[in-house]
């Protein structure tokens, strides 16, 4: 085996390649990165100039989702965070949009530089920007959540309640409890532990749920979001294994139902969502849910969701993924950062563009990012 050594100055790293592709995409939509990134020498600027030379005026329409997509990628690139581009597309990001922050419940704004501005959060902080790990929350909630997870948020709730504090990092105990529940969805835990968590925030669209009992919990809770829930609940009850499980389900559902109906009457879909979440704060609702959930196994929870979804009993569609596919592109091994890798070696005589920028010549196969 022969080993060849070369300096980093003659190589292109994964981070440089991503920056070049990002600049290329800015040019493809006839946009320019914010100052100073468009002027300072960098792989981003190289890609921008190369793209402008290649596309000229033959560019694509820069829609609002496209602008948010490029902004997210720029923000991630500057911090070395990975973005999985096969699934995280402008269309995907548009499916995550909500009118109100699920943590603070304030109406979200756009580009006002206020704490109410919408921002895309990596729910699991040791993963990158990838499908199933993203949710739109307010800038205020995003900054407070920072790198904290499920157990951190629970600790903050206890500290606030024990010390009678107004809040921590601008969030109240109720808001931190929603952060905890949101984080719990993407943190694998035992069936016993997951069955004791109240659904204080319903899972955002396209979020992947790692605990089967919580997927079942969300499936049942969201029945009340759409008309016809009584018929669907009866059909779901008939699917349960055995009389004890059916009896426990009815006991739980009858505890949840009146609290939701009373709070959400004639107030619209958003208030119905909040009413469902608030109903889970009642100790009786959680107690009866836990009793029901522990009559099932994690496997049975998965099967129930799959069967109910096949029968179209859900208010929303659910898609189940194999374990290995659920975290594809999350870069858990590098804790959500771009893995350090050399993608190609520059040729001593690099080709030049008309703008005086050197284009590296690939060695072997160049890893490429989809546009």
Regions picked out by a protein language model, each given a short descriptive name:
Residues 2, 13, 36, 41, ...:
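DEDD superfamily 3′-5′ metal-dependent exonuclease/proofreading module
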Residues 79-93, 99-149:
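Histidine-centered nuclease catalytic patch
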